[in-house]
Amino acid sequence: MEARALEHERRLAESHGQEALKHAIAAAEIYMRAAEKAANPKDRNRLQRKCSDLIALGERLKANAKSAATSARSPVPESTRTLTIAEKTLLLKSSKLHGNIFPPWEKTPASDEFAASKAADGCFTDHSPFTLSPEQQDIFAGWKRPHEIFMDVPERGVDVFMTATESIDLGQDLATDCSVVASLCAAVRQFGPRTGSLLSSLMYPYDDDVKRPAVSQNGKYIFRMYFNGCWRKVLIDDRLPTSSSERTLYVVDRRNPYLIWPALIEKAYLKIRGGYDFPGSNSGTDLHALTGWIPEQIFLQTDDIELNETWSRIKTAYEQGNALVTLGTGKFSREEERTLGLVREHDYAVLDLRNDGNNRLFLVKNPWRDSLVWTGVGSTATSSTDRSGSPEESMSNTFWMTFEDVLQHFDSLYVNWSPSLFRFRQDHHFTWTIPPKAEELVFTQNPQYSILSHTGSPVWILLNRHWQDSELDILRERKQEHDFHQPLKSLGYMSLSLFASHPPGTRIPLSEGSHHALHQGPFVDSPNTLLRYSPTPGVAQTLVIAQSDLPLPSYSFTLSFFSNSPLTISPASDPLPYNETITGAWTRRTAGGSTVYPSYVTNPQYALTLTRPSPLSLVLSTERADNLPVHIAVLYSNGGQRVTAVVGRDLICSSAEYQRGCTFASTLPSSNTSNVTSSVASNNHGHTSSSLIDPGTYTIVLSTYEPGQTGRYSLRVSAACPFTIEPILSDAAGRLRTPAPSPATFRQGEGRVRARVDVARLTRASVLARSVKTGSTTQKTAMVRVALELGTIEGRKRVLASTASGGGGELAASLSNLSLSERLGGIGGIGGGHIHGGQGTTEGDGYSAKGEFADASLGLRTREVDLDPDVIRVYGGLWLVVEQIGGGGQGHVTEGSDDDGGGGGGGGGGVHVEISSDGVVSIGEWEVADED
């Protein structure tokens, strides 16, 4: 049944008029019957919502058919989604701005609200403060009403204040709001006196008979503007800032200086932006607030812009009255300004788009009065066709420019699209507490949404960040510090990206790796950003909101989804429901580096205990400024004990090789099989399935690539069952580190040295050893073995502990040697309680056989053992033994040599050995101890 409804939805997206109405009704009826038969409450609610959306669309389609004869403008979709209490509260809180209240729009004001009888003394006064810049204050002559400014009102009376000539030629003088005036210049074609004029629904009072704004008898004007998540009511009076000179402080029509409605629109907008000393914006943002049209910023200096497609879609929409176009320049020198005739970091209006032979042309207007005009230097235009004659071309400061020249000299192309291009709209409002710096590079705390479409019809998603007083404070502070260039960048950046996740529509941990990015939007310094895409029918996808350097602790946002077929949208859920985030730091003591260093075991470690079989996901991130290469390893370690020696078979899963800033490890199936970023290892401890880890306790090791790389981190762990995670104390916590008096070295023909070890009481200890190469790098590496031995008499000697054959290097080797199938294959579980850390465990006697020789440059370590002074006396002493084979003479001291100890174990620095213990240990001098 639902499949039939989806087919009607598909046809609905492709049809218009009565045909579209027929499919909307048919789909709604099917969903209604399906909802009645649904046994699952969740399915019933989903089907009822789809039915309600289609009924609302049908009502709009019927209303559109009735009004088609009287309206020249297509209907605008409205969000039919029911807001939560939290969302309604958010919108009310966002009404407060700059000491004013801008309530959500409720209804069109009655005409008598503007009567003289409704105001004291017949004149309404808005006491809201409007700030001015120092330059404006120098010539400010007070706030005056139109009849006070224009003492010589023409005979036709006050109507001249609202009556425009055939073409309006707007310009700014001492105003600082170039983007606002450019926006008004571009919007004039939609504000003109005609049926369907945008002004009829944006400015009050409005005279529907003559299709233009009306003069308010009491000086009150009400504007309907879109900002902070909804249409809002903006109230002003008719007083304008006047000047003591010939300069003007508000936008003026050069062809009719009496025309004031553009100046009133400007005043209303500057009221919501903080005053006439407006620090700056962009015209796409301004037009979105003034008209509600969808803003898109196209970056012209990128390599991936499709010129033909971009020109075609913009020109078509512009000619149909569905697009407003403006331009913005970037940074260049004063000399380039004079040469090109373009103002740097300035917004321009586009008044026309035209094809002229092989040239694609923009008619561009500089909103500044008496300012620079494009000189054409370096122009690629080849046509000499006369393009004069239109009213727009006769305006001041206008010039034609080819698309290629626009690409070369402008940074941004702003297009505001009519929402009437779409039939459906959903608005979602939310507050986001900005995560700490250590989590800025990952998405663990980012808002994410699941989007499901049953058709391939295009979807547009607009993210709007609500304005706050604190942002204006930041901009003004930067301006006082003379940081005039790109002031918006001090407010941070944001972006939208779309991902294919597993399971579909669930949250993702970070932008790279096992989650395939379908669309990644740029980070923009604007409060609006747009993502356009064509969905995969029937497959939920994940939308992620990201930010960089947003300076305030929290923000409110609105997501608006536009489409021509219904969408199912909800906050994305976690694929694993149990989560915990812990924070910590790599310090000088705990930044042990990668597995090639013996200090790897000093890295931060955590004991993770799972209560039942579960997949596992881990996300590690650092502060952006640190940009450290980081890694995660999950290891079997005999009940979550601290890892003291790493062997490959203990690896459960790990992240990809060291990645800067953040990384991710997971046993969940990947949605991006072409880009594997975490390793899942098979081992000999048993397993339950390809994605489940057996119940038990594991050790997590967090490392940077090099020892000594310090910085803060955040680790988020997720599982399908309850779990606990606790830090494992470092070996250095409450322990003594006793180095041997000197490195162990070997003379020619020697292969074994030893040093006596003494303890006064029962002591738990382990041995760490590392060779340091200071000799020739071409010498053959020697192999080393280190042990703690009881006694010296053959037959009675016992090896208490010996370094393992793998040492610190085996984990790295095991990761690099895993095949792709092994990385994607089954994950091991946990076996029985056998002891790790010393090879060749002898069951029952508590002693170990000697480990295999290994490259000590990777670091070697024994397991922990108990040193009992009584036992040591019985055996005749305890010895720290270092043995070497190979090396081609490395580390030897020959007769007569000035070198008193070469290196051993692969270099001239010898083997550096120390004992880590919970009690006092003494180590004697080295002596030769070759066995017979």
Curated annotation (Swiss-Prot):
Task: List residues of the Calpain catalytic domain.
Answer: 96-419
Read off the CDD domains from this record.
Answer: CysPc
Q: Which SUPFAM superfamilies does this UniProt record tie to the protein?
A: Calpain large subunit, middle domain (domain III), Cysteine proteinases
Q: Which GO terms describe its molecular function?
A: calcium-dependent cysteine-type endopeptidase activity; cysteine-type endopeptidase activity
Give the enzyme's main class according to its UniProt record, as a single word: hydrolase
- Where composition is biased (Gly residues), the residues are 902-911
Cite the entry's keywords alphabetically: Hydrolase, Protease, Thiol protease
E.C. designation(s): 3.4.22.-
Region annotation (Disordered) maps to: 890-932
Which residues catalyse the reaction? C178, H346, N366
Q: Where are the transmembrane segments?
A: none
Biological processes per GO annotation: proteolysis
Protein purpose? Required for the proteolytic cleavage of the transcription factor pacc-1 in response to alkaline ambient pH.
Name the family.
Belongs to the peptidase C2 family. PalB/RIM13 subfamily.
Q: What name goes with this protein?
A: Calpain-like protease palB/cpr-8
Q: What species is given as this protein's source? A: Neurospora crassa (strain ATCC 24698 / 74-OR23-1A / CBS 708.71 / DSM 1257 / FGSC 987)
What is the taxonomic lineage of the source species? Answer: Eukaryota, Fungi, Dikarya, Ascomycota, Pezizomycotina
